């Protein structure tokens, strides 16, 4: 097999956020898949070991990927390579040549010329979009070219076609690529804030409403993954304005962002608490508890929205009210999930089972009367 070693930009905070010390060692830290059970937290050895599906990777390990199969392996770092680490983040030499140095040099030269030929820029970027989704190449593009791509997105005189291609490249690089996410969050902590404001400004100025909605979706698709593990400072007013865009996809993306921010606030660290400069908790409680009832949502979106709503209600209690039909929806979901848990004979997806339990328990403990929880769930407690 052909293994390619990766340079990882792993921030200690992001990696530690994936491990809950309060549940470490419990049954929730075991994954069962394909007839095999193994720890959720990957334990590295001196030799290369395979990272199994769903395992969390501690920071600071050497990692390599089989480019033909996508399988990952990790090991403890070699001592003489430890000098490459600073503050838990591997140093990336973004000035070195790589596969696309020549192409991006052409783009950079046009931008710096004072009278750029954007047809040249468009051709180069269009040829590069397909490579950005590659795990290794996407990381190289982000670490070498992110500053340039930012300039193209934020430039006032840059054509929308160039902004679009720059956005598509970043979206492709970030998709399912944790090293890219960690690199951007660590090196460019204000990027999310500026991008949301760019989305608002573009929406105001655009003359083509359809084109504007499409580009706003791209910007939000960049923001979404950057907030999964790493809370960022956010201007809530920008999100409020974007939520007014008459597009269901845009509105769902805004709610997913808000849900992740509120979920992050529940960890009680300073960065999470500053993620929202001001917060209209009642409005977002209403919108989240209304949107989660949609029949068109998949399980992933239901979980994401619910975690944010759960965090909101836990933090603010009776000070916030859910949408009038939410408690009825929650009661139906609770009964359906309890029934599924009693009927399932085969081992279930751990993450789904964990979420089902959270939803069931929260019906009375968080969203209703805690005194009713034990009575209503005597049978469930014995599962």
From Swiss-Prot:
Keywords: Endoplasmic reticulum, Protein transport, Signal, Translocation, Transport. GO terms for cellular component: endoplasmic reticulum; endoplasmic reticulum lumen. Residues 1-17 form the signal peptide. The keyword Transport applies. Gene3D superfamilies: Leucine-rich Repeat Variant. One of its GO terms (biological process) is SRP-dependent cotranslational protein targeting to membrane, translocation. GO terms for molecular function: adenyl-nucleotide exchange factor activity. Its main location: endoplasmic reticulum. A motif (Prevents secretion from ER) lies at residues 380-383. InterPro entries: ARM-like (IPR011989), Sil1_fungi (IPR031884). It is found in: Endoplasmic reticulum lumen. Required for protein translocation and folding in the endoplasmic reticulum (ER). Functions as a nucleotide exchange factor for the ER lumenal chaperone KAR2. Interacts with KAR2. Belongs to the SIL1 family. This is Nucleotide exchange factor SIL1.
């Amino acid at each position: 097999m052909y293994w390619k070693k990766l340079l990882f930009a792993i921030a200690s905070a992001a990696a530690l956020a994936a491990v809950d010390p309060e549940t470490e060692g419990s049954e929730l830290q075991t994954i069962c898949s394909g007839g095999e059970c193994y720890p959720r937290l990957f334990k590295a050895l001196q030799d290369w070991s395979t990272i199994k599906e769903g395992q969390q990777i501690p920071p600071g390990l050497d990692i390599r990927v089989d480019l033909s199969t996508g399988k990952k392996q990790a090991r403890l770092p070699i001592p003489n390579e430890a000098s490459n680490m600073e503050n838990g983040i591997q140093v990336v030499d973004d000035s070195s040549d790589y596969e696309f140095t020549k192409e991006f040099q052409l783009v950079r030269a046009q931008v710096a010329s004072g009278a750029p030929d954007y047809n040249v820029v468009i051709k180069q970027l269009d040829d590069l979009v397909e490579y950005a989704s590659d795990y290794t190449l996407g990381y190289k593009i982000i670490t070498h070219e992110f500053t340039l791509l930012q300039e193209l997105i934020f430039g006032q005189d840059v054509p929308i076609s160039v902004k679009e291609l720059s956005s598509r490249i970043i979206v492709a690089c970030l998709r399912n690529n944790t090293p890219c996410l960690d690199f951007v969050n660590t090196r460019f902590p204000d990027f999310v804030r500026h991008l949301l404001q760019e989305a608002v400004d573009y929406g105001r100025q655009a003359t083509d409403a359809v084109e504007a909605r499409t580009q706003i979706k791209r910007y939000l698709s960049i923001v979404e993954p950057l907030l999964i593990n790493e809370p960022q400072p956010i201007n809530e007013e920008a999100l409020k304005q974007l939520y007014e865009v008459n597009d269901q996809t845009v509105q769902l993306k805004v709610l997913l962002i808000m849900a992740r921010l509120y979920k992050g606030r529940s960890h009680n660290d300073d960065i999470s608490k500053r993620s929202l400069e001001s917060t209209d908790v009642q409005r977002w409680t209403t919108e989240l508890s209304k949107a989660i009832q949609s029949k068109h949502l998949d399980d992933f979106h239901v979980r994401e929205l619910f975690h944010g709503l759960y965090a909101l209600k836990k933090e603010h209690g009776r000070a916030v009210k859910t949408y009038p039909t939410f408690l009825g929806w929650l009661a139906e979901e609770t009964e359906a999930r309890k029934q599924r848990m009693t009927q399932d004979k085969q081992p279930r997806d751990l993450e789904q089972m964990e979420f089902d339990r959270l939803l069931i328990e929260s019906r009375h403990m968080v969203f209703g009367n805690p005194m009713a929880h034990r009575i209503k769930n005597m049978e469930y407690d014995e599962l």
